[in-house]
Every structure is written in structure tokens, then in C-alpha cells.
């Protein structure tokens, strides 16, 4: 029987012995214990440091039982918040004080003086702010060195072809964000570019003045400054000719003013998309006369009122927008006159609007054409706006008529 030699021959390759982290730590402890060259001063200078004790509170006990998803998410968020406060080194009492301070709860039991509680809260806030500051600091790996971009390029050129990749991995550079100078004109480059484009378009519209327009669309834009007046005149073709042909003139400026739910002016809106005019023959086919409007029970006492330059629109559909009003009334915009103002009401006055024309003659023409038009399924009812004097006279007249009626009833009885 042959004997098997288990010895490794000298010419065979010996595998490299791998050392684990645990073995390395044990070896360093053994060397530290067997080292006799240390002095008493070195031993006394070393201080014992222990890791602080932590509290483990299982999350399963609080989450046990039946609960909804929102309740579980709320409970989980509270648990994470408590864990983050424990990481700051706060004890249970300080955590309870901070939570009651954040939630605004006031306990009726005996507590410490307000000054002591305020000092504790201030200390907790300082810890939280310090932790946030540390987390915001730029982080880097251990045994690494930060270089500038130029220094990094030099290192790469020097070690090109050398076997020092591990050393290069320890070097890094970080691009710092460029700080913008407030006085730098390059910061306003985008806004300047937009202004130049708009100026070029204005010049193109001015060149087209007096020529037949290629498109039947309406381009409505608001150029209202802080004073509420338009900066540029409107560009309109003759409204009578093109409206009769069913073509929409091209409007350049039209004020579109919206009101917030508190009925306060929030500034002008800009309509820059093409808007087509509603042809006049279509308006005439889909509108009611004043007699037909009075047959509706809601508007049985309909009266347009005394003519003036403000039109009051009511019974508007919720789907009506400024674009719809512009497509109906912008045909009355004069070529060199002031722009027509559109005011849409919201909140309690939703479904109503005011349109201001340059004069009452144009307003009367607009009312005569558009009144009773069926817009988005509802009849558009238009009246002339009433000023404060007309309102007071109307209220006085109604009070007198009511008093006369009551007197007649008493005398008749």
C-alpha cells in the first residue's frame, strides 16, 4: 500500500493567507497585552471611554391590533421622530417636554417653573440646530485629501502609468457652486431676450397694420402697468367688414382683469394664445330677443337700464373664461381708442362679469348684438352698469312704491 505524502512541494504555488477583521483585532489586542515596553505614565494617560447606553423600545407593541393605514403611518412617523430625538442624546423627560412644546399641549399637572422649561427647550433647540449644521457640512472619506481641479490634473499626469491607483482614489476635488453677482448683467439675460422677442413681434404687427390679416385668430395680450392703463395701442381691422364676413380681426391689446374671491383686484392677465372671433351671423342665430328673455321666469322683470359705457353680464356658465368674452366683444375695439377692459368675478359673484368700453355708443352696439346669446348652454343676459347715484335712486323708488302699496291696502280695507 502506497503512502500519500501530504507535504507541499517547494515548487508548488502557496496560496496567500487571508486575514479577517476579527483575527486582526484579536492579534492587535494580544500584542497590546504582551507589550512590556510601555511606562506607567502612558498607562495612566489613557482614559476609559464607554459607549452610552441606548434604550430599545419595540415598535410592535404600539402597532399591535387593528388600525387603518393612515393611523399606522402616523404612528410610524411619531416613532421615527422619537428615535431621532434619542439620537441627539435626549432622555425621556426631555423628549416629552419637546413633544408637548411642538404640539402646543399644556398639562394641568404640577410642572417646573416656566424659566427652567424655557432653558431646557432652548438647549434642545441648540442640539437640533447643531446636528443639522453637522449634517449639512461637506463629507469626505477617511484618509482622503481635497485638491483643487488643477492640482488633481497635475497628480494624474505625474502618476500616469504608475501603479498607484489606490493613492489616487484617496484624492478628490469638489466643484464649488458659482456665486451670482447681483450687479452682473448676465443674470437678466433671459428676461432681456424675452423682451427683445416681444418687441420684434410688436414691430411685425405694426407692419401688418392696414393690410388684410392672414389668420382669422385673435391674439390678446395685456400690457397694463401699475397705473392700470395700457402701454400699447390695439391693432384692429375695420370691425364692420370682417365681422360681416365671419372673420375675426386681430386684436393686439385687451385688458383682462380678474377678481379674487375677496373681490379685490389681483392684477391683469395675459392672453397670448390665438383666439377666434365668433361670427356675427352665428351670434344672431343663437340668441334670444328681449321679449324672449322676459319670458324666462328668472328674468321676467328684465330691463337693460340707461346706456353707459359699462356692461354688466350675468347668468354666465361656470365654463366661461376670459377667452370666451374676448371672442365675443373684442370686435368692438377701436383702432386708436383705449382698450376694452374685461372683469371676471369670482367667489360669491361667480357667474358675473363687467366689460368697460370706450364710450356708451359702442357699449350699446355690443349689448344689441350679444344680449341673449347662448354661451356654453346658458343664456347670456346683459344690462348697462349702474353707478352709485342710479342705485340710490332705484332703492328710493322701490321703497316709495312699497310704501304706496301698503297705504292703498290699508285704505281699501
UniProtKB/Swiss-Prot annotation:
GO terms classed as biological process: mRNA splicing, via spliceosome
Question: What Gene3D superfamilies does UniProt report for this protein, alphabetically?
Answer: 3.30.70.330
State any GO CC term. U12-type spliceosomal complex
Looking up PROSITE patterns in the UniProt record yields: RRM
Return the Polar residues bias intervals: 223-235
- Give the start-end ranges of region Disordered: 223-247
GO terms (molecular function) for this protein are: pre-mRNA intronic binding; U12 snRNA binding
Against SMART domains, the record matches this protein to: RRM
Where Phosphoserine occurs, the residues are 232
Indicate the secretion signal residues: none
A Pfam cross-reference name: RRM_1
TM stretches of this protein: none
Record keywords: Phosphoprotein, RNA-binding
Sequence ranges assigned to domain RRM in this UniProt record: 309-387
Say what the protein does. Answer: May bind RNA.
- Which PANTHER family does the entry mention? RNA-BINDING PROTEIN 41, RNA-BINDING REGION-CONTAINING PROTEIN 3
What's the protein name? RNA-binding protein 41
Organism, per UniProt? Answer: Homo sapiens
What taxonomic classification does the UniProt entry list for its organism?
Answer: Eukaryota, Metazoa, Chordata, Craniata, Vertebrata
Q: Which gene encodes it?
A: RBM41
Amino acid at each position: 500500500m502506497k503512502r500519500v505524502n501530504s507535504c507541499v512541494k517547494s515548487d508548488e504555488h502557496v496560496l496567500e493567507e487571508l486575514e479577517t477583521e476579527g483575527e486582526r483585532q484579536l492579534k492587535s489586542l494580544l500584542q497590546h497585552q504582551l507589550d512590556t515596553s510601555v511606562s506607567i505614565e502612558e498607562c495612566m494617560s489613557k482614559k476609559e471611554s464607554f459607549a452610552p447606553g441606548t434604550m430599545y423600545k419595540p415598535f410592535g407593541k404600539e402597532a399591535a391590533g387593528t388600525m387603518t393605514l393612515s393611523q399606522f403611518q402616523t404612528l410610524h412617523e411619531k416613532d421615527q421622530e422619537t428615535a431621532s430625538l434619542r439620537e441627539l442624546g435626549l432622555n425621556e423627560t426631555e423628549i416629552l417636554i419637546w413633544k408637548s412644546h411642538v404640539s402646543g399641549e399644556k398639562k394641568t399637572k404640577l410642572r417646573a417653573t416656566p424659566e427652567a422649561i424655557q432653558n431646557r427647550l432652548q438647549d434642545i433647540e441648540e442640539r437640533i440646530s447643531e446636528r443639522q449644521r453637522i449634517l449639512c457640512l461637506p463629507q469626505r472619506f477617511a484618509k482622503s485629501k481635497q485638491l483643487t481641479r488643477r492640482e488633481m490634473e497635475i497628480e494624474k499626469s505625474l502618476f500616469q502609468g504608475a501603479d498607484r491607483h489606490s493613492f489616487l482614489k484617496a484624492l478628490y476635488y469638489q466643484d464649488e457652486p458659482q456665486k451670482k453677482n447681483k450687479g452682473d448683467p448676465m443674470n437678466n439675460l433671459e428676461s432681456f431676450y424675452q423682451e427683445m422677442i416681444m418687441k420684434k413681434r410688436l414691430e411685425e404687427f405694426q407692419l401688418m397694420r392696414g393690410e388684410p390679416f392672414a389668420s382669422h385668430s385673435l391674439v390678446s395680450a395685456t400690457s397694463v402697468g401699475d397705473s392700470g392703463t395700457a402701454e400699447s395701442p390695439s391693432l384692429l381691422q375695420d370691425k364692420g367688414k370682417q365681422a360681416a364676413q365671419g372673420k375675426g380681426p386681430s386684436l393686439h391689446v385687451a385688458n383682462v382683469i380678474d377678481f379674487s374671491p375677496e373681490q379685490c383686484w389681483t392684477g391683469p392677465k395675459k392672453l397670448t394664445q390665438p383666439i377666434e372671433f365668433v361670427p356675427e351671423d352665428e351670434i344672431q342665430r343663437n340668441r334670444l330677443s328681449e321679449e324672449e328673455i322676459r319670458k324666462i321666469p328668472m328674468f321676467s322683470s328684465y330691463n337693460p337700464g340707461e346706456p353707459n359705457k359699462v356692461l354688466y353680464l350675468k347668468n354666465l356658465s361656470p365654463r366661461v373664461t376670459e377667452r370666451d368674452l374676448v371672442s365675443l366683444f373684442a370686435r368692438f375695439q377701436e383702432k386708436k381708442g383705449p382698450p376694452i377692459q374685461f372683469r371676471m368675478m369670482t367667489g360669491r359673484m361667480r357667474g358675473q362679469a363687467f366689460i368697460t368700453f370706450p364710450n356708451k355708443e359702442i357699449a350699446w352696439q355690443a349689448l344689441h348684438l350679444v344680449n341673449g346669446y347662448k354661451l356654453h348652454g346658458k343664456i347670456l343676459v346683459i344690462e348697462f352698469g349702474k353707478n352709485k347715484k342710479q342705485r340710490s335712486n332705484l332703492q328710493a323708488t322701490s321703497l316709495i312704491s312699497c310704501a304706496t302699496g301698503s297705504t292703498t291696502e290699508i285704505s281699501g280695507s
